[in-house]
Amino acid sequence: MKFTTLTFIVATFICTISCSSDKKVSMELPMINLAKDYSNEKKNIHEIADVEYIPLETTDESILRGGWVSMSNEYIVIKDKDICFFDRKTGKYLWKFNRTGNSSEEYPMFNYLAVDFRSEECYIYTPIGNKVYVYTYHGDFKRVFALEVGKEFRLSIINDYNQDFLIGYNGFSYRKDPTLLDSHPYYLISKKDGKVSPLPLTVKRPINKKVKPTGDDGYMDSSMIICEMINLLVNENEAFIGDFALDTLYTVQDYKLTPVAVQSPSVFSGDIPLVLSADLFTDTYMGFYAIKLDADNAWKSITEAPYLYWNRKTGEVHRYELYDSNILTEKVYNPWMHNTNLNRNYGVTRLRAEFLVEQYEAGNLQGELKEIASKMDMEDNYVLVLCKFK
């Protein structure tokens, strides 16, 4: 691995504990009890968040299947089969680009997108050649760099960290060959030249998407898939890391690695690993699943996992069933920020056009949603719901 000034920057990380000594901080941090049976509490999303509904304009050029979301004060960017730009306030479709191809200025495969709204650049990662392609907002090629790492390496997530670096996770840490397990799987990546350096966080027994122990400190493949729910989230200039194999949760801000909480019981305290899988991390709330990684009951492990909210300010944990008072029928949804680049304290969710039209015709909508749905067609794009947590 090549080390340049990036190594010096990473060396400035301050950690109040030895990052490989996960147990030392358990007595000093807030404890999140994953084993407790929390009772369901119905909660109106409007009580804990300011909610915006953005109907994304449907044109022949802007038909969306789903897609990951990035946003600034001006734009909403959807990474779907293309990279589509919409107006942040109105949802009006603006433009899109797709540079898939085989030339030196095109990417052969499109895995992950990180948008830098400061420099107005789009960073596209492809595992083919382990490269990051950099484009302008309109898809004009700027540069490409290969991630030169002296071991098995493939990013399973990449996101914007600050003006100089991206942050990513090495997906090869879940290979079943223990010799390929990456004990430092979280990386800063230079936006200038792609130089990489691991964060000083040691993960001795990575498990992530692999759940069945092999007896040699490695984990083998199983049918358990946690749908890319890797515990790396970014809340503006603060990154959250909650590796499945560690009891301690961390944040990374201003090149400082700080433990913020510890789960109980310990991940490996029982026969089946119990992990905290977060997809929301704001100044006040962390939203997460408490999942028993049971290889013999993989689907059940996911479908029966409770979704909980930890209040970072009070230390309380709640099992909220969030509903929207503008929808007069039961619909629970949990805003998320996984693989997104949002304004601070925002989570997102989607409301399908088909659902909204059906509820409108049944008289089950009110307020702004009723007005939006009255103008919609079944085939329209979804309404993006932006939730700014209080």
Predicted regions and their residues:
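Blade-loop segments of beta-propeller domains
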Residues: E57-E61, K92-P127, V149-G150
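Short coil/turn segments at the loop-to-beta-strand junctions that recur within blades
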Residues: D60-E61, N98-E106, A146-R154, T202-I207, ...
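C-terminal motif of bacterial Sec signal peptides marking the signal peptidase cleavage site
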Residues: C15-S18
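A short helix->beta-strand "capping" segment at the edge of beta-propeller domains
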Residues: L34-L64
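Beta-propeller blade signature
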Residues: V134-Y137, L181-G194, L246-Y250, S301-G315, ...
